[in-house]
Amino acid sequence: GHAKGDKKVSKK
């Protein structure tokens, strides 16, 4: 999770 997961997980 970096680009697409960034909106739900801000820690990564």
UniProtKB/Swiss-Prot annotation:
GO MF annotation: an example: rRNA binding
GO cellular component: ribonucleoprotein complex; ribosome
Keywords: Ribonucleoprotein, Ribosomal protein, RNA-binding, rRNA-binding
Keyword S-adenosyl-L-methionine (UniProt): no
Transmembrane parts of this sequence: none
Reported function: Protein S19 forms a complex with S13 that binds strongly to the 16S ribosomal RNA.
Membership in a protein family: Belongs to the universal ribosomal protein uS19 family.
The protein's name in its UniProt record: Small ribosomal subunit protein uS19
